[in-house]
Amino acid sequence: MEDDQELERKISGLKTSMAEGERKTALEMVQAAGTDRQCVTFVLHEEDHTLGNCLRYIIMKNPEVEFCGYTTTHPSESKINLRIQTRGALPAVEPFQKGLNELLNVCQHVLVKFEASIKDYKAKKASKKEPTF
């Protein structure tokens, strides 16, 4: 129970700036009345298919996850609803957090490889005295 309260504190601390200067939470946790912690919808504001599909793919690789899907509410709104349902007693928050961390690791790995490739490319061009892009 304390983990849920800690997560709520963290979630409420995530803010995104709005056009009129007002602040709005970047992440909401929606749970229908009478449901358990294993089935939760996360509303991510200011996000789209880029994050939604990547996160869905990574979360579904977890064998404890029974269902993970996302929808965009409307093309003119930049928010997604990510629904996670787990097997057993695992709260849906855990695969969500793990998925975000794994996605961050993948992105960092891609960035490191990309920057190394650019550095190698420029070094080869410099040694041949060819102009780079």
Swiss-Prot record:
<dbReference type="GO" id="GO:0005736">
    <property type="term" value="C:RNA polymerase I complex"/>
</dbReference>
<dbReference type="InterPro" id="IPR036603">
    <property type="entry name" value="RBP11-like"/>
</dbReference>
<dbReference type="GO" id="GO:0005666">
    <property type="term" value="C:RNA polymerase III complex"/>
</dbReference>
<dbReference type="GO" id="GO:0005654">
    <property type="term" value="C:nucleoplasm"/>
</dbReference>
<dbReference type="InterPro" id="IPR022905">
    <property type="entry name" value="Rpo11-like"/>
</dbReference>
<dbReference type="Pfam" id="PF13656">
    <property type="entry name" value="RNA_pol_L_2"/>
</dbReference>
<dbReference type="GO" id="GO:0046983">
    <property type="term" value="F:protein dimerization activity"/>
</dbReference>
<dbReference type="GO" id="GO:0003677">
    <property type="term" value="F:DNA binding"/>
</dbReference>
<comment type="similarity">
    <text>Belongs to the archaeal Rpo11/eukaryotic RPB11/RPC19 RNA polymerase subunit family.</text>
</comment>
<comment type="function">
    <text>DNA-dependent RNA polymerase catalyzes the transcription of DNA into RNA using the four ribonucleoside triphosphates as substrates. Common core component of RNA polymerases I and III which synthesize ribosomal RNA precursors and small RNAs, such as 5S rRNA and tRNAs, respectively.</text>
</comment>
<feature type="modified residue" description="N-acetylmethionine">
    <location>
        <position position="1"/>
    </location>
</feature>
<keyword id="KW-0007">Acetylation</keyword>
<dbReference type="InterPro" id="IPR008193">
    <property type="entry name" value="RNA_pol_Rpb11_13-16kDa_CS"/>
</dbReference>
<dbReference type="InterPro" id="IPR033898">
    <property type="entry name" value="RNAP_AC19"/>
</dbReference>
<dbReference type="InterPro" id="IPR009025">
    <property type="entry name" value="RBP11-like_dimer"/>
</dbReference>
<dbReference type="GO" id="GO:0003899">
    <property type="term" value="F:DNA-directed RNA polymerase activity"/>
</dbReference>
<keyword id="KW-0539">Nucleus</keyword>
<keyword id="KW-0240">DNA-directed RNA polymerase</keyword>
<comment type="subunit">
    <text>Component of the RNA polymerase I and RNA polymerase III complexes consisting of at least 13 and 17 subunits, respectively. Pol I complex consists of a ten-subunit catalytic core composed of POLR1A/RPA1, POLR1B/RPA2, POLR1C/RPAC1, POLR1D/RPAC2, POLR1H/RPA12, POLR2E/RPABC1, POLR2F/RPABC2, POLR2H/RPABC3, POLR2K/RPABC4 and POLR2L/RPABC5; a mobile stalk subunit POLR1F/RPA43 protruding from the core and additional subunits homologous to general transcription factors POLR1E/RPA49 and POLR1G/RPA34.</text>
</comment>
<keyword id="KW-0804">Transcription</keyword>
<dbReference type="GO" id="GO:0006351">
    <property type="term" value="P:DNA-templated transcription"/>
</dbReference>
<protein>
    <recommendedName>
        <fullName>DNA-directed RNA polymerases I and III subunit RPAC2</fullName>
    </recommendedName>
</protein>
